[in-house]
Amino acid sequence: AGGIAEMSGLPEDVRKTTDALDAVGNTTKAVTKGYAIGSAGLAALVLFADYTHNLEVAGKMQVFSLSDPAVIIGLFIGGLVPYLFGAMAMEAVGRAAGSVVIEVRRQFREIKGIMEGTAKPDYSRAVDLLTKAAIKEMVVPSLLPILVPVAVAIGMNILMGDGAGIRALGGMLIGTIVTGLFVAISMCTGGGAWDNA
């Protein structure tokens, strides 16, 4: 809002008001991110508890021991998933932004008068391009939480015998919970610091 007020040439008091609202919005956003991370962590713990409960109901209850290689492998894979997801999401944002830069340069080159203010840029084309790029780029990262557990369960059963997949999947859930919480907190505080720098 402050940028719009500045570009519109509105009076200084409008800018002061928008700055105050912006500060309140940033504070609210930072606080609610913490709540969201906490609730996601609790939801992940409930998911693990439900997993063990369903194993017990099915008569396939396993002991998730740290001396079990299947559990250790699951822990490492689970610990890797949040980092992999974060990296893929950041790469996706970079590629989507790059496509917008190319489109903006094309419009400056082909539509005469944009810099002088005599012609309007094609906003809808840039927004449409960004929307399509964002959806396309997030397909693979969004498949990670679906495909990795299936691959771990099937792969470990093939490699280490029947029952290893169940134990590895339990380890994977625990690993994802632990590293996922810390990655989320790190990204939240880092992003908040960069946002308010």
Swiss-Prot record:
Which coarse location class applies to the principal site listed for this UniProt protein?
Answer: membrane
Which InterPro entries does this entry report, sorted A to Z? PPase-energised_H-pump
Reaction equations catalysed: diphosphate + H2O + H(+)(in) = 2 phosphate + 2 H(+)(out)
On whether Transmembrane is a keyword of this UniProt record, the answer is: yes
Any single GO CC term annotated in Swiss-Prot or TrEMBL for this entry: plasma membrane
**MF terms in GO:** diphosphate hydrolysis-driven proton transmembrane transporter activity; inorganic diphosphate phosphatase activity
Where is this gene product found?
Answer: Cell inner membrane
Q: This protein's superkingdom?
A: Bacteria
Keyword Ligase attributed: no
Pfam families linked: H_PPase
Alphabetically sorted, this entry's keywords are:
Cell inner membrane, Cell membrane, Hydrogen ion transport, Ion transport, Magnesium, Membrane, Translocase, Transmembrane, Transmembrane helix, Transport
The EC number(s) this enzyme carries? 7.1.3.1
Give the top-level enzyme category. translocase
Tell me how this protein sits in the membrane.
Multi-pass membrane protein
Which residues does the UniProt site feature Determinant of potassium independence point to?
29
- The residues that cross the membrane are 30-50, 70-90, 139-159, 168-188
Give the required cofactors.
Answer: Mg(2+)
**Similarity annotation:** Belongs to the H(+)-translocating pyrophosphatase (TC 3.A.10) family. K(+)-insensitive subfamily.
Q: How does it assemble?
A: Homodimer.
Q: What does this protein do?
A: Proton pump that utilizes the energy of pyrophosphate hydrolysis as the driving force for proton movement across the membrane. Generates a proton motive force.
State the protein's name: K(+)-insensitive pyrophosphate-energized proton pump
Q: Which organism is it from?
A: Allochromatium vinosum (Chromatium vinosum)
Q: From the UniProt record, report the name of the gene that encodes this protein.
A: hppA
